[in-house]
Amino acid sequence: MAKVRLENLRKVFDVPDGEEVAIERVDTTIKDEQLTCLLGPSGCGKTTLLRMIAGLETPSEGRIHFDDDDVTGIQVQDRGISMVFQNIALFPFKSVRDNISYGLKYEEVPKDTVKQKVDDIATQLDIAEFLDQMPNQLSGGQQQRVALGRSLIRDPRVFLLDEPMSALDEQIRIRLRTELKELQRELATTTVYVTHNQEQAMALSDEIIILNDGQIEQQGTPDEIYDEPSNTFVAEFIGSPRINLFEATLEGTTLTIDGSDAGVELSETAVPESGEAGREVLLGIRPSRLRLSPESADDNLRGTVVLVEKLGQEDVAFLDCPVFDEEVRVETDRTDIEEETTYDISFDPDDVHLFDRDTGEALRPDKAAKPAQ
């Protein structure tokens, strides 16, 4: 297994009207023996980054290290990596056993050892009973397990997966991602997993690297990414329903939502620059952190429910608030929320996220800057 270190990595493609930058100055370390997801929207550069780690693309600039080994110029077959792609590519006329063992075909491994390794990996992937069957006799999920087994049997230094579950049904995807996480922990294989699906990334990852326009927006554990987003892009990309962002003004320790008299008092430790004049910010609140209560005469934030999505254990209410351009999203376990009814909307000061209104960067207690004079 290996730690993957990317230094000042850049990838530029030639296009008819000039150049297209796919990866722009990526510096990061992917930890040994962990599962790290490269997460981002389509076109953000995550697959290009994975292909450079694999050796399928050559960096325009920068270096790639596996532990202390510079592998930037090393051919893909000599890097000690295994890769599983989105499309399941099994040999249709070979048995499951032969498909799995194919990963060792060009290595000098005794036949008895190969058989034992195939048996072991098939048992771990719960496909031992299918070893003598052909791929067309298997379900999509079983075929993907065979593809995983063929890659893992080589004991790779780094295991790379490019959206391997996107073509599978939802229930199969959920089951397979659980099995993959358990297997990765058991084998302690350094794993890099590309996905655009935030739910998969949150469920699978030890760490997540969020990419946008070829650059890293944030890297951290799923909890860090969700609870402490580095900017509004991360805050809006992670979490479903999407975070609410309100324009607000910070006056000392008082946070007031623009266009209303509704506000909250923040602790001085949460807002170090508490003595400043008013600062324009974006106030972020997760839908699960908002509360609905009957309309009152107080100066509260309020909105009228226009739609309730019934999702089972919790519902999502969408409210029209006169002071906002967008509907406010509230996740609630209450069953008595009615459409076309007005409610007060409240939240705990400890649940707010503050962002600079101009840059979108998170405002932390240790780096809240003074407003421009």
Where do the PLM segments sit?
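Helix-to-loop junction immediately C-terminal to a conserved catalytic motif
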Residues: 54
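ABC ATPase nucleotide-binding domain
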Residues: 5, 29, 65, 344-346
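ABC ATPase nucleotide-binding domains
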Residues: 74, 79-86, 90-236
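A short, flexible loop at the N-terminus of ABC-type nucleotide-binding domains that lies
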Residues: 1-6, 12-25, 29, 73-78
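Conserved coupling/switch loops of ABC nucleotide-binding domains, chiefly the family-specific signature
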Residues: 60-63, 213
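The feature captures the beta-strand-to-loop junction immediately N-terminal to the Walker
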Residues: 39-41
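Non-catalytic connector elements of ABC transporters
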Residues: 252-373
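Conserved ABC transporter NBD signature motif
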Residues: 62-70
